Amino acid sequence: MALPALGLDSWSFLGLFLFQLLLLFLPPATTAGREGQGPTPRVKYHAGDGRRALSFFHQKGLQDFDTLLLSDDGGTLYVGAREAILALNIEDPGVPRLKNMIPWPASDRKKSECAFKRKSNETQCFNFIRVLVSFNSTHLYACGTFAFSPACTFIELQDSRLLPISEDRVVEGKGQSPFDPTHKHTAVMADGMLYSGTMNNFLGSEPILLRTLGSQPVLKTDNFLRWLQPDASFVAAIPSTQVVYFFFEETASEFEFFEKLRISRVAQVCKNDVGGEKLLQKKWTTFLKAQLLCTQPEQLPFNVIRHAVLQADNSSTDPQVYAVFTSQWHVGGTRSSAVCAFSLKDIKSVFEGKYKELDKETSRWTTYEYPDISPRPGSCSKGPSSDKALTFMKDHFLMDEPVVGTPLLVKSGVEYTWLAVETAQGIDGQSHLVMYLGTSTGSLHKAVVSGDHSAYLVEEIQLFPDPEPVRNLQLAPTQGAVFVGFSGGIWKVPRANCSVYESCMDCVLARDPHCAWDPESQTCRLLPTPILKSWKQDMQQGNPEWACASGPMGRSLGPRSRPQIIKEVLAVPNSILELPCPQSSALASYHWSHGVEAIPEAPSTVYNGSLLLLLRDGAGGLYQCWATENDFSYPVVSYWVHSQDQPLALDPKLAGIPRERMEAPLTRVGGGAALAAPKSYWPHFLTVTVLLALVLSGALVTFLVSPLGALRARGKVQGCGTLPSREKAPLSSEQCLQPSKEGRTSASDMDADNNLQGTEVA
């Protein structure tokens, strides 16, 4: 729209001048959420943000809520904390409710022994619960560090409540729980037997894979044969039909590298393994391990595995293992993380492939072809293995080929520590993989994997105001929530926050499989079961122009430029206004318009998304902040700006749109107050005014000092500015005394004190 010529009276000239100075002294604008490489969370909630409803459970005197177990019926969450085990009722909405709690502290004798071994009695010499699994419908099985003396026990259940632990049922837990609470570990119950991976000694230098409980014989890895490196660190155990897979990382022995190279592994042991009769007695006879490779082309690999889970989808013929990786190298000085998917078929295929063999003469690993032994060594065949097969297995436990994963999500500047996954069915009938990722700084990311096997981030929730790692994640599908364990308690996070999307287009652009637009209630809601086809969702493209095109959309589409509500700003002339633009999506780009034109030539600037405007004659009218996302543009907020001196009638095209008046004062140049947005720039105005006064004062002083200096220079003795005193070296006839035409500064005119002599009177 054409703008009238602006007259410059004294106040408007001063306002224009101060407005330009204000822009010079504004602090640097902040950049929104595009830190690092990889997908950006569309919506980010800071700690305490009221838009994201969270529930928090804590118990006075307890800490280190590290171990979580969901009951079979999904209504109870069992929690292993420091020296206590809790049962929480999670069926009711809101904060989880404590059913009961049983203490399980380390004995005083064990704590004294722990302190005697130079361990901290403030942070280490306690019983940290590390294993909490369901043994059957009436008992849990728990293990703890027990002040560096691991112990285990059965816990009886009665109506999902925990019965007290009997001391005579506490047994040694070596090999099932770590000694040190900081050591990583894993354990899983499969077919009534406990498979655990942990450190087996006080020093933390003897890793072990152990099978206990059940009817099968107790088996473990052979430490003498170095099947595992001394620094092996276990992160997950996943049972399959015939085998149990262990996921861990250790120092690589098969590669020559200029530094200590960490490598991620998957190992397998057969469930029907009974150990050897002569060789490998009470040892695994089916232990094999292979490299896990999670990398992008021409990039350093993500070689440190942090966690892994199996997506148990009954409809899938090829189950997938999803694992979180970081890198031991900080590329660009920042941490980076990746999520890779591994097919169980690919893992099985690698374990059926070629082996590696250590050449004892060169100390190098070489490829070994298939052995001429039947059944194949390491296979889950029935019956005892031959001595030839067992001899072969002692030295051929490493597979030649790696298991190559598919990168789904790669992000720099973040370190993922935990992972939970589920599938969600959309309106299109397709299943969509949803991942919940905990970070080392206390955030929770919700990611969705699209059809091209790449993930996008729906939201980021900062759980803690201060950085603190997520200790554990437990998904409760029947409750529609994710439970997050950390040092001080348990967070209950609803897995979707549909109500934050206020329009159909915002709901569709979010591409959250749990959310869809209900045209009847005109709200974005959780997708019901069974799915209603009349609801609006587009998981493939996120195109609101297509998804919201038909049916009653409420506050959704219509003419794109037509706002949903107009915020009326009635201000005085020459006032500095801030018109905020709520940036609900970090994936959108934002720009401002004035009517149907671009921002006018009136003094204005965009600062942190907000429009700073000096209101002058002709600068009123409709101001709109626009968002463009996924090639779709829509107005985010609309302002009708006019002055108190010359009210501007609302454009007839905007008739019928609800209006909201803004009544917050802002700076006015020349006195008075303006009505606009809630933030005041009065401090900036004062700063600019003071600086202007200082500049003017400095200029005035400079102007006055220059002539005074010239006058003073004329009054000085020519030649030397000052004459030395009598205590200094006497002046020579050539020093500083130049003959003058008037003869008043010759040596004969000076007395002994270097003073000018007067004329004698006769």
Swiss-Prot record:
Instruction: Give the Ig-like C2-type domain ranges.
Output: 574-632
Disulfide-bonded cysteines = 114-125, 143-152, 270-380, 294-340, 498-515, 507-524
UniProt name for this protein: Semaphorin-4A
The protein's gene is named SEMA4A
The answer to whether UniProt assigns keyword Hydrolase to this entry is: no
TM segment ranges = 685-705
- Ranges where the Sema domain occurs: 37-495
InterPro entries given in the database record: Ig-like_fold, Plexin_repeat, PSI, Semap_dom, Semap_dom_sf, Semaphorin, WD40/YVTN_repeat-like_dom_sf
